[in-house]
Amino acid sequence: MMTLTTDKKTMNITEIQSLLPHRYPFLLIDRVTDYEEGKYLIGLKNVSVNEPQFTGHFPQLPVFPGVLILEAMAQATGLLAFKTFGAPKENELYYFASIDEAKFRKPVTPGDQLMIEVEFLKERRGIALFNGVAKVDGDVVCSAQLKCARREF
């Protein structure tokens, strides 16, 4: 369980874009509302009906794809990795390495605000392990264990 600090550290979209290589329509963290290096990060994703995935998923009943919830978690782990271990060298990147125990509990629809909470568990040989939870209005909609790796390209 995460222990939140009273002095919140935040990141706006400009700082997020300086750390992650993703861009529209694949940048899935709009804002970081709190983080502590080596411990946790809380990010927000505002789900809008104007996003391209809703033209086909599904036109009659738009549902935010579960794989994009997991990608948002992966991006949050990348941000926490940057803040915990520092920026990689010019020829390095944090890669999403694996996901385990992914569970989807409720659908996410346009108008929802996803709160992505990731918690750093441990690091070994350049591979970091995290727990991730996505919530809407305080209800868990998805949870998973994620790994990211720092590698040269």
Curated annotation (Swiss-Prot):
Q: What is this protein called?
A: 3-hydroxyacyl-[acyl-carrier-protein] dehydratase FabZ
Cross-referenced CDD domains, in alphabetical order?
Answer: FabZ
Tell me which EC number(s) this protein carries. Answer: 4.2.1.59
Q: Which InterPro entries match?
A: FabA_FabZ, FabZ, HotDog_dom_sf
GO biological process terms on file: fatty acid biosynthetic process; lipid A biosynthetic process
Write the record's keywords in alphabetical order, separated by commas.
Answer: Cytoplasm, Lipid A biosynthesis, Lipid biosynthesis, Lipid metabolism, Lyase
Localization terms from the record: Cytoplasm
NCBIfam families attached to this UniProt entry: fabZ, PRK00006.1
Keyword set includes Lyase: yes
Q: Which residues form the active site?
A: H57
Q: What does this protein do?
A: Involved in unsaturated fatty acids biosynthesis. Catalyzes the dehydration of short chain beta-hydroxyacyl-ACPs and long chain saturated and unsaturated beta-hydroxyacyl-ACPs.
Main enzyme class:
lyase
Catalyzed reaction equations = a (3R)-hydroxyacyl-[ACP] = a (2E)-enoyl-[ACP] + H2O
What organism is this sequence from?
A: Vibrio cholerae serotype O1 (strain ATCC 39541 / Classical Ogawa 395 / O395)
For this protein, the record's Pfam families field holds: FabA
Question: Which Gene3D superfamilies does the record cross-reference, listed alphabetically?
Answer: Hotdog Thioesterase (3.10.129.10)
Its gene is fabZ
Example GO molecular function term? Answer: (3R)-hydroxyacyl-[acyl-carrier-protein] dehydratase activity
The similarity annotation says: Belongs to the thioester dehydratase family. FabZ subfamily.
Keyword Lipid metabolism: yes or no?
yes
Q: GO CC annotations?
A: cytoplasm; membrane
